[in-house]
Amino acid sequence: NQYAGCILLLQGVYTGNCGEMTGTNYGTTDDITTLMNYQASLIDPSIYLAVRTPTHLRSILKTKTPLQADQAYDGSLNSRLGLYNDGMLGSVFDLGTYDDTPFSDPYDYEEKGTREEEIAYQNIICQFVPNGGEAVLDNEYNDLNNAIRDLSRMHISYLNRSHDTAVLEKWKNSTYEESGIWKGSSGYDYIAAHLGYRYFVSKTAVDFHPLLDDTAELNITIDNLGFAPAYRRFTTELILTNRESGDSVTVPVDFDNRRLSAGCSSVLSISIDVRNLEKGDYNLALSMTDETLELPVTFANKNSSSTVFLGTLTR
């Protein structure tokens, strides 16, 4: 708890081989539910918790209904419990994570679904809770195109960079062939760049009538090109810097970036009180900061570091 700001997620409940909740004397639903509830009561609520399979998660929460947007981020165990998969992409079953028979009983929380059913389930809940693990065992399910498809649908935020080397080397020796700026890059580089969130400012527009208005309306479109959302709220600001004097004006932006799902876009509408600005030319930049880590959020735009240059405004 002392280092809660540096910890995204705690995997497992300290049971099983390598902490993976398998091969344990404490693996019944009652056991893992007791352990998880007690652990949740002790761990800082800003830290997410995780279990090895979707079946574990449903068994603990006693529901097959996926977490919904109106339940997210309220501090409850339901809103904190995510997943880690150390058999990821290892077989059609992800090494025991999934089954070969479809769901049949809506009240049997311990049954496993098929690969497609369970990935569809993760596609919903992992818009709000993290998912990660390690990709293992070189096989068709971690061939590059298959891996990208499923990592995206499962909303994967992190992977072990040391294991499985056979899979990681395969990605390093594979080439991303889709059109766009990544064409020709290694599969490893593409996957690494898309784990978690990846923000990109794709469009800006200003609506201002000097003879009629005192304020300008700036619209900024942000795309999330990553596999997952961010699960921590960042501080977002617009910075106007006078190009002659260097003086800056900061405009707070009310934006809950956690709600920007993977593959989606949000439009930020910001009112700028132009009449209260000193006359001159201003550079406009967007800033996003992780206040917990005291670090800037870097966008995917070219030449962006701590801010994204948006354009200029003349008063």
Where are these regions (language model features)?
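Short amphipathic alpha-helices and their capping/turn segments at secondary-structure boundaries
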Residues: N1-Q2, F208
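Residues that flank catalytic or metal-binding motifs in active/ligand-binding sites
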Residues: C6, H155, F234
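Catalytic-core regions of glycoside hydrolase
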Residues: L9-L168
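Hydrophobic/aromatic-rich, well-ordered segments within soluble, folded domains that form packed cores
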Residues: A4-G19, A216-L225
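Extracellular/luminal regions of secreted and cell-surface proteins that mediate adhesion/ECM remodeling
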Residues: A192-R315
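Catalytic cores of secreted or luminal carbohydrate-active enzymes
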Residues: L144-A205
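Acidic (Asp/Glu)-rich catalytic clusters
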Residues: Q2-A4, Q39
